[in-house]
């Protein structure tokens, strides 16, 4: 249980060092959110 937060912090740190990857991830997350909303509206 103690190792999980550390891994998340390391991942966030690497994302801060690589803004390009962070931009891609945020776009990917936004696409998932949009897809979820559209699926909910259809159903």
Swiss-Prot record:
<dbReference type="GO" id="GO:0010447">
    <property type="term" value="P:response to acidic pH"/>
</dbReference>
<protein>
    <recommendedName>
        <fullName>Uncharacterized protein YqgB</fullName>
    </recommendedName>
</protein>
<keyword id="KW-0346">Stress response</keyword>
<dbReference type="GO" id="GO:0005737">
    <property type="term" value="C:cytoplasm"/>
</dbReference>
<dbReference type="InterPro" id="IPR020196">
    <property type="entry name" value="Uncharacterised_YqgB"/>
</dbReference>
<comment type="similarity">
    <text>Belongs to the YqgB family.</text>
</comment>
<dbReference type="Pfam" id="PF11036">
    <property type="entry name" value="YqgB"/>
</dbReference>
<keyword id="KW-0963">Cytoplasm</keyword>
